[in-house]
């Protein structure tokens, strides 16, 4: 059986600890919806916190990355496929 793990990692400020979290989904579609939802929510937070549109976004089918232009604050959402028995 395959499961899809959404791994969230982020650093909010240069020198701060990198935080991680993971969620497991039974379909790739659910995992993709999760990273899209998380990415859009994070993007809104960036707009409010940074009070500008000065950030970078990279998106693919299994990856969502958002960061400020200095790279001091960033959020990643990745999907990893895992086979379990």
Region locations from a protein language model:
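N-terminal cationic amphipathic segment used for targeting or macromolecule association
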Residues: 1, 20, 29-32, 47, ...
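Short aromatic-glycine-(Arg/Gly/Cys) micro-motifs in beta-strand/loop hairpins
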Residues: 1-21, 38, 61, 79
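Generic hydrophobic secondary-structure signal
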Residues: 3-6, 24-25, 35, 44, ...
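A residue-level detector for conformationally permissive "hinge/kink" positions
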Residues: 5-7, 31, 53, 63
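Residue-level signal for short segments within beta-strands and strand-turn junctions
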Residues: 7-10, 26, 68, 81-83
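Short, flexible N-terminal segments of the mature chain
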Residues: 18-41
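Short, mixed-charge low-complexity intrinsically disordered segments
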Residues: 37-85
